[in-house]
């Protein structure tokens, strides 16, 4: 009887952990160090091509100013999309979700995300964290 209760409790805990993991599909895609001078070639290359439907940007360390962002998809035509992003992100702030794959082609996967911008109000380099949701 004791082993039946132990097995039942183990299964219940496993199911709770399983459902919790599936409910949150957010993944940190990467972190970029933002230089102090305006730079337009900051790239986050994803080693494994991922289907990503939307992203969030977060300033983990320092304030940063962004002047543009593009997302590139693994495709024969090297398809890309320009993203509508906020111009400033303060330290500790996270943006709303930014939708990508807007043409409803959910089969395309993201291979690279590029940014233009720089650190502001700091002598240290700010860090930009990119979070993806599939």
From Swiss-Prot:
Is Signal one of the keywords? yes
According to the record, the signal peptide region is 1-23
Q: Which InterPro entries match?
A: UPF0412_YaaI
Statement: the UniProt record of this protein carries the keyword Protein biosynthesis:
no
Q: Which keywords belong to this entry?
A: Signal
User: Which protein family is named in the record?
Assistant: Belongs to the UPF0412 family.
* Protein name listed in UniProt: UPF0412 protein YaaI
